[in-house]
C-alpha cells in the first residue's frame, strides 16, 4: 500500500485471522476473556486485481458458557467451533452432507487439531482449527483459541425460501460487565429478578444471568 494508515498496515492482508487475534489480545488486556469475534471482508493472495477474495472468519476464546449457577465452566473445544461452523454453512444453504474435513490447514493452526473443509477433491469451502500455541504467544494471548474461515464465493448456494433479516444496530458504547448480589425472599423466582433488572433499561442492558446462589444463614 503506497499510503498506509499506519506502519503496521503497509501490506494487503492474506487472511482476516491475524486481525481477529489482535482484537482478542486488546480485549484480554481489558479483562475480557470469553470472546466471540468475527469479520467478513476481503483478503489478498497477490498484488494483481484478480488476487482479491472474500472471506468470513470467526475466533472463539474462553468458556463455552459464561458463569452461571447451573453447570461448571467448560473451555471451548474443536467440536464446539465445528458446530458453529456447520450452523453458519447451513444458514448459507451450503451442501453440508457433501463436505469433507481433511488435513493441511494453514500453519497458524495446530497441525493435529485443524482441518480444511472441501467440497469434492478441489473446492475449498473453508478452514477450522485450534490456533497454534506459538501464534497465541506472539499475540500475548492467554488460554487456547479456535478459529474458522469460510470462503463464500466457493460455496454453490442452494435455493432458499428464507426472508432477509434487517441488520442489528451496533451500540457506540463500550461493553461493561458487572456482578451484583441481591438478598431476596426464597419465594421470589429468579425470572422475576431478571425481568426487573431488564426493565431498568432494555436498550442498554444486553444480558442478565444468574451465576451463583447462596441460601440459608451462611448466605448472610
Question: What do the PLM-derived regions correspond to, one by one?
Answer:
Residues 14, 18, 52, 79:
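Electropositive phosphate-/nucleotide-binding environments in soluble metabolic enzymes
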Residues 37, 51, 65, 69-220:
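A carboxyl-terminal module marker
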Residues 4, 19, 23-27, 43, ...:
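Generic, well-ordered alpha-helical scaffold segments in large soluble proteins
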Residues 58:
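Conserved catalytic motifs of ABC-family nucleotide-binding domains
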Amino acid at each position: 500500500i503506497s499510503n498506509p494508515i499506519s506502519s503496521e498496515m503497509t501490506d494487503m492482508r492474506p487472511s482476516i485471522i491475524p486481525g481477529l487475534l489482535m482484537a482478542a489480545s486488546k480485549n484480554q488486556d481489558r479483562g475480557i476473556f470469553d470472546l466471540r469475534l468475527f469479520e467478513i471482508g476481503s483478503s489478498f493472495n497477490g498484488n494483481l486485481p484478480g488476487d482479491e477474495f472474500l472471506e468470513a472468519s470467526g475466533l472463539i476464546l474462553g468458556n463455552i458458557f459464561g458463569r452461571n449457577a447451573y453447570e461448571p465452566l467448560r473451555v471451548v473445544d474443536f467440536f464446539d467451533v465445528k458446530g458453529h461452523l456447520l450452523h453458519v454453512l447451513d444458514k448459507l444453504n451450503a451442501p453440508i452432507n457433501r463436505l469433507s474435513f481433511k488435513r493441511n490447514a494453514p500453519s497458524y493452526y495446530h497441525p493435529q487439531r485443524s482441518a480444511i473443509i472441501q467440497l469434492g477433491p478441489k473446492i475449498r469451502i473453508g478452514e477450522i482449527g485450534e490456533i497454534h500455541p506459538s501464534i497465541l504467544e506472539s499475540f500475548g494471548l492467554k488460554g487456547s483459541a479456535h478459529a474458522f474461515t469460510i470462503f463464500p464465493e466457493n460455496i454453490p448456494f442452494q435455493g432458499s425460501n428464507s426472508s432477509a433479516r434487517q441488520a442489528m444496530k451496533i451500540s457506540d458504547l463500550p461493553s461493561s460487565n458487572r456482578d451484583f448480589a441481591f438478598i431476596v425472599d426464597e419465594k421470589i423466582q429468579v425470572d422475576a429478578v431478571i425481568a426487573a433488572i431488564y426493565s431498568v433499561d432494555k436498550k442498554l442492558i444486553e444480558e442478565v444471568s444468574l451465576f451463583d446462589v447462596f441460601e440459608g444463614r451462611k448466605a448472610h
